């Protein structure tokens, strides 16, 4: 499960605006590249992602390992499914009770599933030996609560939102994570990864 997050745990404000959360994607000199000369460019303005060297190495390694993205319908609608071309991975699974919009990018490998558990099963089938990346937020929280998330990745930005859309959605209950096994300082961002502690694990 992954997303960019404020220090107080929000991935967007109440109107789904990310404010300064994504500024670090454009604050450095090193482009994020993958697959040879292919550039990950989903800035909307064609400027591409240019980050610090530390962030570029971290993000490149993570994105290169992803085969499938799992996202909620709200994010799909906000970004129009990245116009059928996700930032990484070969497939996208959208958790939604509504089908794919008629005529929307028929060439794109987007799969609409109305249940989070079924979405994870489908994503694993599509991913093969590669990773399944779950977008944090309401859908990510449901998948985490169902015990279907192995790792929590957070790109923590030094800003306080105070309110908005939470990284962990409306999750109700306590879940323990292991100590972070990845801690990388970028420019205006701290990259963290935690394994999810399973029930019965002794501290």
Provide a role label for each language-model segment.
Residues 1-146, 158-203:
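Portal/gating segments that form or line small-molecule/metal binding sites
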Residues 148-150:
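Short acidic amphipathic segments
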